[in-house]
Amino acid sequence: MLNIDEIKKLIPHRYPFLLVDKITELEVGKRAVGIKNVTVNEPFFQGHFPEYPLMPGVLIVEALAQVCGVAMMSVEENKGKLGVFAGIDKVRIKREVRPGDTLTMEVEMTTLRKNIAKADAKAYVGEELVCKGELMFALVEK
């Protein structure tokens, strides 16, 4: 398990854009499971939507990407690199994410090479599938 301080050593995201609270499972370079406790205090709820707050789908995908970042950057050879989005495919949003929900994100790296990475990613609230898709990253030197 990784706490927020350990996550911040692996990925560069910071408040208000750090969307992972903890990592509950990590197989270095292979898979990771992360948690985001969604609260009414999230800055994006001020405008999306004040009368009916929903976590934007693009931020659910970003949260999944950050869990991928932890899996990728936990590999010793990737220290000092940055994983940046190179593509997203077959993404589907299946359910709303609202304040009070706990978002569980599961990612499995399907490709992890010197300069490219791909992952299958799924997010859940409880047992309900929220989002799924394929994410691709370029690994670049900082």
Swiss-Prot record:
SUPFAM superfamilies: Thioesterase/thiol ester dehydrase-isomerase (SSF54637). One of its GO terms (cellular component) is cytoplasm. It is found in: Cytoplasm. Keywords: Cytoplasm, Lipid A biosynthesis, Lipid biosynthesis, Lipid metabolism, Lyase. The active site is at 48. Gene3D superfamilies: Hotdog Thioesterase. GO terms for molecular function: (3R)-hydroxyacyl-[acyl-carrier-protein] dehydratase activity. It holds the Pfam family FabA. It catalyses: a (3R)-hydroxyacyl-[ACP] = a (2E)-enoyl-[ACP] + H2O. This is 3-hydroxyacyl-[acyl-carrier-protein] dehydratase FabZ. It comes from Clostridioides difficile (strain 630) (Peptoclostridium difficile).
